[in-house]
Structures are given as structure tokens and as C-alpha cells.
Amino acid sequence: MVQKAIVILAMQPIFGPLRTKLGMVTRAFFAQRDLNNVKLLEEFYETLESGVHRSPAKDKSISSDEDGNTLYMGTSIRECVHKWRFRTLMLLKLILLQKRIMVYGYPVEHLCTLQYSLVSLIPALLPHLQDAAAPELNTLSRDRVKAESLRMSDRDSLLAYMGLPLPLFSHDAFFQPYCPLQQIDNLRCKTWLIGTTNQIFKHQKTSQPDVIVDLYKMQLSFLDPTLHNLVSLTPADRKWMDDVINVVQSTWNSADPAQPVQMQYKGSDDYLRARFEEYVFGLLSTAKYCELH
């Protein structure tokens, strides 16, 4: 049996908006039972193209917040916090420290969703992954200009002043939510975040991970014991994270885990993303203060 697939190659990780559309088109296309009839695919392509030309990345009249809202579709911070609880903050710390992180398990959709949800916790990072596909790419750092002023009413100005986006997946770094064996050589770089369902990645010796995130066992396995101590939560971290977890638990909707009860703002992904943004801002401010004093 020959398997066929329809694949979208996109410049931005807009998987949430594309997933539903692609599913419907794929089912309709194969239901025709005529692979030579590609009119449906041509119309789908034209629809996507027109959407891209009106996307936030192309249209400067659309705010970065709207841009983010489009990219964040398909991620679920609520489910991440609900499942991983205090370990959510440990995973965030591991990414910020640019460690080698391997996420292992099935299904692939959950594998990828967890990684994109974690990356989305870091302000402005998800829309700036242009260097993540190969360790030798470094456009984000090369094109960076130091902010000389701050306009508090302008979110883009605030992000730039805080040094964002952080070049976490730029030079000598690699991010591949579902990594094929053909890219295993990229794991020789300094830092990476990958997802895999293949045990070969877990047992290869040349580029071992610092930590393995096991979706089956819901646990973090540290190959370096000192790293566990490094990312362990401080009393202040635990208190802060406890508040976040309580908000998620008190608004949990088992019928629709992605949305809080009564569709309120508190407990939503936007609310949680704002809380984690405050955490990252506080972390960066503290690091800068320590550097200057």
C-alpha cells in the first residue's frame, strides 16, 4: 500500500489555524478517489495565500498582539500547567538556560503541542524562530539593534527594551518539535529542544540530552544531577507557581480543557501567558541588576 499525504510548508508556526482547514481539505481530496484532480488543492492554496498576505506578519497595521494570538492558536498552557504543575516552571528554566532537552512519547500531536506551549511562555519567541531549523543560522542576533528608548504604551518598544526576543534558538541551537533521524547530526550543537517517538535518540551516545521529558511517565529524567538542583524551584518560585496552578484548577473545565469555566479571562491561556511574561520580565530585570551591581 502506498501512503499519500498533503503537507503545508509555512514560514511561521501557525499550526492551530491551519490544522482544521487542512484536515477538512485532506478528507475531501482523498474522498474524490482521483489524485489527478487537484482543483481542490489549488483553491486551498489560493485561500492560504490570500490569508498570508493579510496576516499580521505581512500587515504592519495589525498589532503584535494580534500576530501572537494567531500563532498561539493550537497551544494550550492550561493543559500544560494542569498536567505538569510545578514542573512547568522547571521546563521553562531549562529552556532559558539553553539546555539539551528531549521530549519523548506519543502521540506526536501531544509531543509537539507541549513544546510549542512551553516556547510560547517566553515573550516574543514563538514569532521569531527563523534560526531554529539549523544550528549555523544566526540572523536574529546579527540583525539585533539595542533599544535606546522606551515607550511604555508601545508593546513592541517594551519588548525590545527588555532585550526580547531572546536568541535562545539562534546560533549553535536547534529546535525541532518532531525530529527525524536524518537530522540527528544537528544534536551536536550546544543547545536544543526536540521531540521524538524513536528510542534511538534516547540511546545514542554522541549527543546525549541534559534532560529527558517522558510523556508516558510524566517525569523529567536528569542525566546531570547538578542540573536538577539548578532548576529546582525556590520558595518564591513555588509560591508563585502555586498561585498559577490554583487558578487553573479552580477554572478547570473537563468538557473543554483549553477554556476556563464561563469563558472568563482569569485562567485562560492569555491570562497565564501574561503571568509567565511577568515572571520572565522579573527574571531579566534581576539579572540586569546583578550585572550592574
Where are these regions (language model features)?
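Acidic, Ser/Thr/Pro/Gly-enriched alpha-helical scaffold modules and adjacent low-complexity linkers
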Residues: 1-293
